Design a protein with these regions (language model features):
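C-terminal accessory regions
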Residues: 359-384, 536, 543-545, 618
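Accessory DNA-binding and partner-docking regions appended to nucleic-acid-acting proteins
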Residues: 1-3, 356-357, 386-681
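The −1 position to Zn-ligating cysteines in a subset of zinc-ribbon hairpins
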Residues: 326, 376, 391
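Short flexible coil/turn linkers enriched for glycine and charged/polar residues
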Residues: 198-200, 321, 371, 566, ...
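Gly/serine-rich nucleotide phosphate-binding loop at the start of the catalytic core
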Residues: 59-60, 246
């Protein structure tokens, strides 16, 4: 049996992706390998298939217990003899699993790196004949990486202590050139064959949204994607708990995951999400590598993470099945303060802090750049950039760009006038013409450009400064309170040798509302009744087998069944993702559903919140016109959005919406409640 036979027999695929076959053949030829492949590119198959074909056992060192559990369940379900040892497995049971591996009953053994501490266990492990040691999430070994784990530093000494050195292979989804070099040195892979498939994930669309009511956006988005699995990442435990509470109050089946919960609570939350008992997981970065769920359709970052490495890894939890998925980052300047606090209050040495600030600045620039988001990420990881992707939020807004050279020159001259000694807040205040105590004390009211942008909002000026940093016209120098300095690119503009194009001041405000409406439209993809019937059968089988539904078949495989409608076992075996083992086990059950056909197509209902919101806008605008006041003086758009979502039935409930005081409740409360409920209460 060769690699292609194993691929079809156990995994149900006819062909390999990209460089999978090259990686596998290199391993089988007896050469060490280091592979940097994006999440969803099929890294696991690259070591699982050789493990099946090599004569002795394979140990896979993996960082998170929950990931081991999911992978072993999936392999066992496919008929592959696998097991794991970690802190959840009793000591005697761990030793027994080593005995089973020694006897050839187990081909793949997943192991936590903490198990490599010298002990009787490692003594027993050294007596087990091994063909290969696999280091998964290998970036964890690098002190320059975003997820450094000291336990990974023990791997090389463990391998060196074995009576006979096995093949050593290392896999990761994200690694900058610096981290890649550190991985080679720390794992003893200087002579390894290196495979870089490119980190691009074409099925993912990226979006950055600034300002607005982030909580409301998430509530509406999740509600309009209620049948799809998603992850919402927050920067703090408190934010996780608050978002979880709001989603639960809104009737959304959500789970939460952070380090402040007990092991049992986290395990239960993980299982509920994996088994589709909850559709949304709200989590800190403690929940990331520990999820192997293939059908996550969206990942939303409620707050900006600490680095692009973290962001791309967390966003990469979406669309592992290859189907389209969305990655949305909701950015606010306050997020920078949170991450700065984490860096300043950590126990890292100064050099590590410096690296952390560099990574944080790159993350901020991603949020502020006006260029293609996909290309920005690829360039950061040392990849060659391509044509703009055409479907990230920046590419979609490209037509809104205009010539802004005059404004850029004004800003660059201000930076020079201030002798490149101040940060964005001071520069923006000077341009705005703010006569603050600080500016007076620093004698900055006499700067030639003082007040030249007095007609612009202060926030818009700061946003422009950040965009110029992200696009390479300015750079930050010093931490934690950086000053802004000109780059050669900005100096060319001042010399009249280059023009600057970007968004007009405040243009993002207008586009933000349009983007929200677009994002809140429910998906209209053709998910007919047959697909839903197949999903229901999968859910039933998963409950019978006590495994997550995606372990039975992925969404992509069910969609292929619904599309191709096989009528025989032979035709079912040709469906992408249906292997021989699963065909024999489940084929007839799924064929029965396909032959019977679907009852009726599933039709998405129209979003009632959007209709009510329009009615509330009309009522608010009518009141404003009658009283001769600005609309926001009556109720802000954000307050109306919360009314449409929470639907208060009384004046008391209306008063709970943020920013609505007793006077407004008394004056307009009855009108608002009647607009929402009519004569029903």
């Amino acid at each position: 049996m060769g690699p292609r036979d194993v691929l079809k027999e156990y995994f149900g695929y006819d062909t390999f992706r990209t460089v999978q076959e090259d990686v596998i053949s290199t391993i089988l030829s007896g050469k060490d390998v280091m592979a940097i492949m994006p999440t969803g590119a099929g890294k696991s198959i690259c070591f699982q298939i050789p493990a099946m074909l090599l004569p002795k056992g394979t140990v896979i060192i993996s960082p998170l217990i929950s990931l081991m559990k999911d992978q072993v369940e999936a392999l066992t379900e496919q008929g592959i003899p696998a097991s794991y040892v970690n802190s959840t497995v009793p000591y005697e049971e761990s030793i027994e699993r080593l005995r089973d591996m020694y006897r050839g009953k187990i081909k793949l053994l997943y192991m936590a790196p903490e198990k490599l501490e010298p002990s009787y266990f490692t003594h027993c492990l050294s007596m087990v004949p091994l063909s290969m040691v696999v280091i998964d999430e290998a970036h964890c070994v690098s002190q320059w990486g975003h997820d450094f784990r000291p336990s990974y530093r023990k791997i090389k000494s463990f391998i060196d202590s074995l009576p006979q050195r096995p093949l050593v292979t290392a896999f990761t989804a994200t690694a900058t050139p610096l981290v890649e070099q550190d991985m080679k040195e720390s794992l003893g892979l200087a002579a390894a064959a290196v495979f870089r498939t490119g980190l691009d994930r074409p099925n993912l669309s990226f979006r950055v949204m600034q300002g607005g009511n982030r909580e409301y956006f998430i509530l509406r988005y999740v509600k309009s994607h209620r049948k799809e699995s998603g992850i919402i990442y927050c920067a703090t435990r408190k934010a996780v708990d608050e978002m979880y509470d709001r989603l639960s109050q809104a009737g959304i089946t959500a789970g939460r995951y952070h380090a402040g919960m007990t092991d049992e609570e986290r395990r239960q939350a993980q299982d509920d999400f994996s088994y589709d008992r909850t559709t949304v997981m709200v989590a800190t970065n403690a929940f990331g590598m520990g999820i192997d769920k293939s059908n996550v359709r969206y990942v939303i970052h409620y707050q900006m993470p600490k680095s692009l490495e973290s962001y791309y890894q967390e966003a990469g939890r979406a669309g592992r099945d290859g189907a389209k998925a969305e990655c949305i980052l909701l950015y606010s300047g306050k997020d920078v303060h949170i991450q700065t606090y984490f860096i300043e209050n950590g126990n890292q040495p100064e050099e590590q802090k410096r690296m952390d600030y560099q990574r944080l600045n790159a993350m901020i620039d991603y949020c502020q750049t006006s260029s293609c988001l996909r290309n920005y990420v690829l360039a950061y990881f040392g990849e060659k950039v391509k044509e703009p992707c055409g479907h990230c939020s920046n590419c979609e807004n490209r037509t809104a760009k205009v010539r802004i050279t005059d404004a850029a020159v004004l800003i660059f001259r201000t930076v020079l006038s201030l002798r490149e000694r101040y940060g964005a807040s001071i520069i923006a205040a000077v341009l705005k013409g703010k006569k603050t105590k600080e500016l007076i004390e620093k004698d900055l009211l006499t700067v030639p450009t003082f007040g030249k942008l007095s007609f612009e909002k202060l926030g818009h000026i700061k946003s422009a400064l950040n965009s110029f940093v992200a696009d390479g016209y300015l750079f930050r120098d010093g931490q934690p309170y950086p000053v802004l300095k000109l780059t050669d690119k900005a100096k060319e503009v001042l010399a009249g040798k280059a023009e600057v194009y970007g968004l007009a001041f405040g243009a993002e405000d207008a586009m933000k509302e349009a983007a929200v409406e677009r994002d809140l439209d429910p998906r209209r993809e053709s998910r007919d009744g047959l697909f839903e019937a197949l999903r229901e059968l999968r859910r039933t089988l998963a409950a019978e087998e006590h495994v997550p539904p995606f372990v039975i078949f992925s969404d992509a495989t069910l969609e292929a069944m619904a599309r191709e409608r096989p009528e025989s076992m032979e035709a079912m075996g040709a469906v992408h993702g249906v292997g021989a083992f699963k065909l024999q086990k489940y084929g007839e059950r799924f064929l029965e559903i396909i032959r019977t056909g679907a009852e009726e197509p599933v039709i998405e209902e129209k979003d009632p919140d959007a209709q009510l919101l329009q009615q509330l806008f009309s009522v608010r605008n009518a009141i404003a016109a009658k009283e001769g006041l600005a609309r926001n003086r009556i109720f802000t758009d954000e307050q109306l959005q919360e009314m449409a979502f929470w639907r208060p039935k009384t004046k008391l409930e209306l008063k709970r919406i943020r920013g609505i005081g007793p006077k407004k409740v008394d004056r307009y409360g009855e009108t608002i409640v009647k607009c929402i409920w009519g004569d029903r209460i």
